[in-house]
Amino acid sequence: EIPLRLVGSEMCIRDRIATRTSLIIDFGGGLKQEDDLEIAFESGAQMVTGGSIAVKNPEMFTSWISKFGSEKIILGADAKEKKIAISGWEETTSQELIPFIKGYYDKGITKVICTDIARDGMLQGPAIDLYKEIRDEIPFLYIIASGGVSSIEDIEKLSEAGIPAVIFGKAIYEGKIQLKDLLRFT
């Protein structure tokens, strides 16, 4: 493992994106200590997402919520069959998805990126029922759905289900969603 503070090329790229665009940057992956967050924020990230760290070191992750504020810390909740997966999806834990998210909501988290691993990159449609279940259980949580989006209709269905944000990639790369089609959601 390479500590985040030694990964100069990623910091340089993030810095260039931050200074040359008006994009809001969320940095995730490899956050293991407070210094990593400081560097991410100094390099232009407005938010950071912690997933594995929230499982492996909940005290540290909770301290980040207190120190940096819930508007800057996003919980990453990657799930396989409603169990939390960590370490780049290499390990599935015994922690149930919704109680895991609820526990951090009770500690101040206001945003979660929830990825249904089985659907990610598969273009089979998002896990709308799963996101509705989370929304029903934790109504004031800002849910960012991830995984499975294959069309603009999928995004519409998420919006209709009360899911305010979505992450997708493959549908853009494969031309199934055009950027111009997204303008109606702004």
Write out the residue ranges for each language-model feature:
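Single conserved hydrophobic/aromatic residue that forms the stacking wall/gate
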Residues: 1-8, 12-13
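Short, small-residue-enriched loops and turns at beta-alpha junctions
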Residues: 9, 83, 119-124, 174
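Short loop-to-alpha-helix "cap/lid" segments that border enzyme active sites
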Residues: 14, 90-114, 125-140, 144, ...
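Catalytic cores of alpha/beta
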Residues: 14-17, 21-47, 129-165
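Short acidic, glycine/proline-enriched helix-loop-strand junctions
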Residues: 23, 68-71, 138-142, 184-186
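A cross-family glycoside hydrolase active-site/sugar-binding cleft signature
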Residues: 26-28, 51, 74-78, 115, ...
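Conserved anion-binding
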Residues: 45-120
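C-terminal helical cap(s) of enzyme catalytic domains, especially alpha/beta-barrels
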Residues: 60-68, 159-186
